[in-house]
């Protein structure tokens, strides 16, 4: 919820709402009105997830990650195909947009840029077939994106690459990105992304958050129990 809160407001939950308790609570209410969070303290089958989304008449559904779903047969390959087919039917019959997040296979996680390349030693973005389970996910999906970040690059670690690998419906203007020309999203202050220097959500933010920055050393009750793991610690010289 912390990161969703930040991107919802374009401000830092841990720094910009220390005195604006009303704005803080209003934002929490907005988020809980728009999102239903499925508890992560147990595992679900794909059918159970779809039933939950149908129960709440959701406009959209995110399954993250796919490998967290329980299996119901010994033939995982065929079950994956069946699951993808069931998700497509669910989308068509309920008009629910569904996103499925999946990880790379192990070999793809070893695929780095070669010597003398400008990104030498950094991980390459995944292809469609590099998904756990293989090409079948791209085959069954209407659209397929590879989201990549070179987390160990000294300058580009905060830039997310969005490679649009497949777009089924192109007649309305959609298309894939060109090879090696992804959409670049620059991460700023843990609460915003910009594309080509522009924040596409700039006009959607509510006027909430502290206006007076002199109180940044203060902590209100709702922030005292917040996890400090949401943001990186200050840099130091220790090797660990």
Task: Name what the model sees in each region.
Residues 1-2, 69-72, 107-112:
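Short acidic/His/Gly/Ser-rich catalytic and metal-binding motifs that mark active-site loops
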Residues 1-56:
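Cytosolic-facing regulatory segments adjacent to core modules
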Residues 6, 43, 67, 104-105:
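Active-site-proximal loop/turn and secondary-structure-junction residues that shape catalytic pockets
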Residues 10-11, 15, 46-58, 92-94, ...:
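C-terminal regions of RecA-like/P-loop NTPase motor modules
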Residues 20-27, 42-48, 76-86, 127-133, ...:
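Helical mechanochemical/support elements of P-loop NTPase systems and associated helical scaffolds
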Residues 36-93:
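Phosphate-binding/switch loop-helix module in NTP-utilizing enzymes
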Residues 62-63, 96-103:
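Structural recognition of the conserved hydrophobic beta-strand(s) that form the central parallel beta-sheet
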């Amino acid at each position: 919820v912390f990161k969703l809160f930040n991107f919802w407001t374009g401000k830092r939950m841990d720094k910009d709402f220390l005195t604006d308790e009303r704005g803080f609570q209003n934002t929490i209410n907005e988020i809980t009105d728009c999102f239903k969070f499925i508890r992560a303290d147990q595992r679900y089958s794909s059918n159970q997830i779809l039933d939950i989304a149908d129960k709440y008449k959701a406009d959209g559904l995110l399954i993250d990650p796919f490998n967290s779903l329980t299996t119901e047969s010994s033939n995982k390959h065929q079950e994956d195909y069946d699951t993808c087919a069931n998700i497509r039917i669910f989308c068509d019959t309920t008009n629910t947009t569904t996103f499925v997040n999946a990880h790379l296979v192990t070999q793809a996680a070893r695929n780095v840029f070669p010597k003398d390349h400008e990104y030498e030693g950094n991980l390459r973005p995944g292809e469609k077939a590099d998904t756990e389970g293989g090409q079948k996910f791209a085959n069954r999906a209407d659209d397929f994106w590879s989201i990549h970040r070179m987390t160990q690059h000294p300058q580009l670690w905060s830039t997310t690459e969005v490679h649009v690998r497949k777009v089924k419906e192109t007649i309305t203007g959609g298309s894939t990105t060109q090879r090696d020309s992804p959409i670049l999203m620059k991460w700023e202050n843990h609460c915003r992304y910009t594309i080509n220097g522009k924040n596409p959500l700039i006009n959607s933010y509510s006027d909430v958050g502290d206006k007076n920055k002199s109180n940044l050393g203060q902590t209100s009750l709702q922030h005292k129990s917040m996890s400090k793991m949401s943001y990186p610690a200050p840099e130091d010289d220790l090797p660990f």
